[in-house]
Amino acid sequence: PVGAFVANAKFAKAMEPGDHGSTYGGNPLVTAAVSTVFDILKKDSIVENCKEVSEYLLEELDKVVKDYDCVVGHRGLGLMQGIVLNVPAKKYVQALLDEGVIVVTAGEKVIRLLPPLVITKEHVDEFITKLRKVLA
C-alpha cells in the first residue's frame, strides 16, 4: 500500500513524524512499483481509454434503459456504474455470472459494474449483448 496527501502550511505545521503514515507504505520497493504504474498509465493512455470507453458504455446503457421496463436507469462515475432495476437484481446478476460476466449487486435492485481500466468498446459490446440476453 502507498498513499499521499497534500496539506496547506497551517495543517502541515501541526503534524509531527508518525502522525500520518504507514509502517510499510512508503518503502523503496512500493514507491518504485507506484512509479512504474504511473509510467504504464501514461504510456498506454489508460486514462484516455477510460474516458472514451466510459462515454460509450453510458450511451449503450441509455439504450438499455429505453428498451427494458425493468431497468429504470444507471448511475455512477465513469466505468463504475450501477444499473438500477425496479425488481430484485439477484437473478440477473447470477445470469450474468453464468454468462461469464463478473458483476455484483449493490443493494437489492442494482447491478454493479466495475470493469478493469483496460476495457475496450468490444468488451462493452459483449457485455451489453449478454445483459440484453438476461433481461429478455
Segments (PLM) and residue ranges:
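Conserved N-terminal phosphate-binding loop of PLP-dependent enzymes in the Aspartate aminotransferase
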Residues: 1-136
